[in-house]
A protein has these predicted regions:
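A glycine-rich beta-to-alpha transition motif near the start of alpha/beta enzyme domains, typified by
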Residues: 1-62, 73-74, 92, 97-229
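Ligand-binding beta-strand-loop-alpha-helix segment within the catalytic cores
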Residues: 70-72, 82
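N-terminal, positively charged, Ser/Thr/Ala/Gly-biased leader segments
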Residues: 79-83, 88-90
Length: 229
């Protein structure tokens, strides 16, 4: 669920239902604002939940681009899924954390083990979102599982912008080379990622994607369920 508040077009902000940050929702929000002629420039900033500073955004002819939150740390570790140990890369941010697991194939049993792992952990309260990306590197393909503790959700998503960004960071980390327009494929489509190393364990990362409006309508939400940015 995304909500937005507009104050004569000067105070644009996006608030997610779990107060988390979402790259895909930010791209969708840019599209929403552009359709309603509420943005006048190709490059601008938006305030988004889960991010303490304004988010840099760009409008291209075919894509919307979002500068992603900065990485705090990339760490190699092992996670136990069922009876097996898997090598994983832990990528942490201000308000969310991702685990990337390299795999050759993904089946229902593997997905269930990942769900069990996420559900069994006690996550630090700073993390609004926990994500696990099952990454088939040869196909540049991910299966993203997203958990939002505040609302108790645990969903295999068709597309995850922040997960795609973490893949860009990981490829940069593993190759020690900046990447430009790296295609991250997902069940629901593809996202373009660029990642540049800007310091010790620091990465400047952007995602680009295409957005179209498929339906419009009115949403009625109980006031007490709404979150504040």
């Amino acid at each position: 669920i995304e909500s937005n508040n507009l104050n004569h077009g000067d105070d644009c902000r996006l608030v997610m239902s779990g107060n988390e940050f979402c790259g895909n929702a930010t791209m969708s929000y840019i599209h929403y604002l552009k359709e309603r002629l509420l943005i006048q420039h190709q490059q601008f900033q938006l305030r988004v939940s889960g991010c303490s500073h304004p988010v840099e955004c760009k409008v291209h002819s075919q894509h919307y681009e979002v500068t992603m939150p900065k990485v705090h740390q990339v760490k190699e570790r092992f996670v136990k899924l069922g009876d097996q140990q898997f090598k994983a890369f832990e990528i942490s941010y201000d308000t969310y954390i991702h685990y990337v697991l390299m795999c050759d194939g993904v089946d229902l049993a593997m997905k269930q083990r990942v769900e069990d792992f996420v559900s069994a952990q006690t996550w630090h309260q700073q993390f609004k979102t926990i994500g696990v990306m099952l990454f088939q590197q040869d196909k540049q393909f991910i299966y993203p599982l997203i958990h939002i503790p505040k609302i108790g959700s645990l969903i295999w998503e068709n597309s995850c912008g922040s997960g795609a960004a973490s893949i860009g960071v990981l490829v940069n980390y593993l190759t020690n080379h900046d990447i430009q327009d790296y295609l991250v494929n997902q069940p629901g489509g593809s996202i373009i990622v660029s990642s540049r190393k800007s310091g010790q364990n620091e990465y400047q990362t952007t995602i680009k994607g295409q957005v179209s409006t498929v339906a419009t309508g009115q949403a009625y939400i109980e006031q007490e369920t709404m979150t504040q940015i």
